[in-house]
């Protein structure tokens, strides 16, 4: 039997399997990273929606805004998001700066923020 008729040796098979397994591990890492990224994007999306909602509410409210901080909880995406609205006077006393920060459930880190200005009434 000649060398070309014998087929693959055990060593060649082990090397081929090792190369294939490295490729499989790389694909699994990529899938895991995609899942983590999707979860982070979901958090930022809902936090941004809550921040925008509260900021627009502050701009469009008919009554005057109290200077200082207020906080509350808003439901979005089936979860309760904590928001804090800080109202401060701007450089011009007729302008108010409204900063809304939003934290995801079970954490204290800020995931979304909106800053708007409105006329003090």
Residue ranges and their predicted role:
Residues 1-8:
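N-terminal leader/signal peptides at the extreme start of proteins
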């Amino acid at each position: 039997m000649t060398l070309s008729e014998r087929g693959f040796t055990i060593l060649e098979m082990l090397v081929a399997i090792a190369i294939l397994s490295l490729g499989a591990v790389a694909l699994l890492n990529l899938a895991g990273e995609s899942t983590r990224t999707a979860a982070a994007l979901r958090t930022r999306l809902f936090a941004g929606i809550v921040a925008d909602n509260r900021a627009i509410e502050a701009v469009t409210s008919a009554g005057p805004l109290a200077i200082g901080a207020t906080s509350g909880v808003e439901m979005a995406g089936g979860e309760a998001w904590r928001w804090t609205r800080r109202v401060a006077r701007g450089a011009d006393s007729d302008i108010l700066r409204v900063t809304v920060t939003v934290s995801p459930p079970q954490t204290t880190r800020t995931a979304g923020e909106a800053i708007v200005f409105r006329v003090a009434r």
